[in-house]
A protein has these predicted regions:
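Dynamic "connector" segments at or just before major functional cores
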Residues: 1-200, 224, 367, 390-425
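An anionic, glycine-rich sequence signature occurring as long contiguous blocks
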Residues: 2-7, 230-334, 414, 420-425
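Structural motif
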Residues: 18, 49-58, 294, 343-353
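Short amphipathic alpha-helical "interface-anchor" segments enriched in bulky aromatics
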Residues: 30, 77, 140, 312-351, ...
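Acidic/histidine-rich, metal-coordinating catalytic segments
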Residues: 137, 206-215
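Short, glycine-/Ser/Thr-/acidic-enriched flexible segments
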Residues: 139-141, 171, 180-182, 238, ...
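Short, surface-exposed basic-aromatic patches at helix termini and helix-loop junctions that form
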Residues: 202, 221-230
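Basic, amphipathic alpha-helical segments enriched in Lys/Arg and hydrophobic/aromatic residues
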Residues: 339-400
Length: 425
C-alpha cells in the first residue's frame, strides 16, 4: 500500500458555482460599454444557414473574449461553456460550431473585419496622440505541414507566413496588421498600408515613421516626403555608405579606434537626390576587435532621414527606440496567440490573425483608458495574473447576480477602482 503524508484528507472539483476568472468582468464590461458587438454586426459572412441558433457576431465575439482571456486551444471552448461566470450573460456554442464558423469566412469578411480593427485604433490615436510615431516591422508566423500560402523564409530559415505590422509607438496600437504569404518580401505592401493609414490619421506634418533596413526603398522615401512624414530608416550595409562614413570621420579628424560600442562616434553627411532635394545620412561608428586585434575598418551603423534638426546622436537614439515596438509584436504573438495559425486555408488563418490583432488593440485601449500608473505598461500576461485570475463565487437569487470574490485577493482596492472607472464610461 502506498503511504501518503497529505496535508488534506480529500480533494474534489465539486465546489459549485466557482470561477477562476473573476477579473474577466473588467474587460467584459468594457467591451459592452464600447458597443463592440454592434460594430461586429456589419461584418459579412457567406452564411446559408436558416434560423441559426448562434449568429456569426455572437461566435466571433466569443472568440475575441477567449483570446483576451488567454484561452487559445480549441478545447478551451469547453471552459466558456462550463464556467459559471463566463457563460452567465450569453449562450456559449460548442467547438464544432466554432469550426463551422470559419467555413463561412471569405476575403470580404477579413477585409471588413480589418477596417473595424484599424478604425478603432485611428479613433483612439486621433483623439489621444498629438505626435504619432509609426513603427513598421515584418515578423514570422511558423507553419506546419501543408498550409496554404506558406513558404520557406530565408531570413528566418523556416516555413511560415510573413506578416507586416505597423504600430503607433505611444499607444502601442496596431494601425496595420497584414498577414502576408510566406513568399512576400519584408516591405511588400508597406506603401499600400500607409495609404490607408494616412487617409484616416490627422496629419499636420507631425507624423514620424521608423523602419529597419527592409524598408530602405527610394519609392518609400519619396512617398513619405510627399505626405509630409519625417522618416528614420536603417540603411543597408552598402560599401558606399561605409566608405562615405569613414571619409567623414577622416575629414573631422576622428580616430575610430578611440570609440567603442558603448561610446561610439556620431556623424552625418548628406546625399543629393536632385538639384533641390537632399537626404541626410546619420551614422555611428566604433572599432571592432577580433582575436584581440583591432580591425582596420570600423563598424558603421547608418540611418537615412529627412530630419535635419536633430543632432546625429538624437536622431540615432530616436531610431533605436523602435526596438520597443518589436516587443509589441512579441506581445501580439505570445500573449494573444498571433504566432500560432493552425488552419489549412489562408483566409481562415488571416481571420485568426485579425482576431488576435483586435484583442491586442482592445486590451491596449482598455489599458490606456482604465489602468493607471505602472499598470499602463504591463503586458497582457501580467495583467491576467494580476487582475483576471481571481477566485469568485457566482450567486444567483431573485433575478439578481452577486459575485463574491476571494477575500484574500491582494489587489482588491485597485480592482474596485478600475471597476468603477469602467462603469462610468
Amino acid at each position: 500500500m502506498i503511504q501518503t503524508n497529505s496535508l488534506f484528507d480529500k480533494i474534489n472539483f465539486n465546489g459549485g458555482n466557482l470561477s477562476s476568472d473573476g477579473g474577466s468582468i473588467l474587460l467584459s464590461q468594457f467591451l459592452k460599454k464600447i458597443n463592440l458587438k454592434k460594430l461586429l454586426d456589419s461584418i459579412p459572412f457567406v452564411d446559408l444557414r436558416h434560423l441559426p441558433v448562434y449568429s456569426n457576431t455572437n461566435i466571433l465575439f466569443q472568440q475575441i473574449i477567449k483570446c483576451l482571456l488567454g484561452y487559445n486551444d480549441q478545447s478551451d471552448q469547453k471552459i466558456l461553456i462550463n464556467d459559471p461566470l463566463l457563460s452567465l450573460k450569453s449562450l456559449i456554442c460548442s467547438q464544432a460550431t466554432v469550426s463551422r464558423f470559419y467555413d463561412r469566412v471569405s476575403l470580404n469578411t477579413t477585409n471588413e473585419f480589418k477596417k473595424i480593427i484599424t478604425q478603432l485604433a485611428y479613433d483612439f490615436v486621433n483623439t489621444n496622440i498629438d505626435d504619432p510615431i509609426l513603427d513598421a516591422d515584418s515578423t514570422m508566423v511558423t507553419t506546419c505541414g501543408n498550409q496554404e500560402a506558406s513558404a520557406y523564409i530565408h531570413h528566418y530559415q523556416e516555413n511560415g507566413y510573413h506578416p507586416l505590422i505597423i504600430n503607433e509607438y505611444h499607444s502601442k496600437l496596431l494601425l496595420s496588421s497584414l498577414l502576408r504569404t510566406g513568399s512576400a518580401y519584408s516591405s511588400n505592401g508597406i506603401i499600400e498600408e500607409l495609404e490607408q493609414i494616412f487617409t484616416q490619421l490627422n496629419n499636420t506634418g507631425n507624423i514620424r515613421f521608423r523602419g529597419d533596413s527592409a524598408f530602405y526603398r527610394r519609392d518609400l522615401f519619396k512617398y513619405l516626403e510627399n505626405n509630409q512624414v519625417t522618416y528614420y530608416i536603417r540603411v543597408k550595409n552598402f560599401k558606399k555608405n561605409i566608405r562615405e562614413s569613414v571619409m567623414d570621420m577622416v575629414i573631422n579628424q576622428a580616430d575610430w579606434n578611440d570609440f567603442d560600442y558603448t561610446e561610439p562616434y556620431y556623424g552625418e553627411y548628406t546625399i543629393q537626390i536632385n538639384k533641390t532635394k537632399k537626404r541626410r545620412i546619420v551614422y555611428k561608428a566604433f572599432h571592432l576587435e577580433k582575436g584581440g586585434m583591432l580591425q582596420l575598418v570600423p563598424m558603421v551603423y547608418c540611418i537615412i532621414t529627412n530630419d535635419f534638426e536633430k543632432s546625429p546622436k538624437e536622431a540615432m537614439d530616436f531610431y533605436e527606440a523602435r526596438g520597443n515596438s518589436e516587443n509589441f509584436t512579441k506581445e501580439l504573438k505570445d500573449d494573444f496567440n498571433g504566432g500560432i495559425l493552425s488552419h489549412k486555408e489562408f483566409v481562415k488563418n488571416e481571420m485568426d490573425f485579425l482576431i488576435s490583432s483586435l484583442a491586442y488593440n482592445l486590451y491596449h485601449v482598455f489599458q490606456q483608458t482604465i489602468l493607471e500608473e505602472k499598470d499602463q505598461t504591463i503586458r497582457m500576461n501580467t495583467y491576467r495574473l494580476k487582475y483576471q485570475k481571481i477566485a469568485v463565487k457566482v450567486i444567483q437569487h431573485a433575478r439578481q447576480v452577486t459575485l463574491s470574490f476571494s477575500s484574500a485577493y491582494k489587489n482588491k482596492t485597485q480592482f474596485t477602482q478600475y471597476w468603477n472607472k469602467v462603469l462610468q464610461i
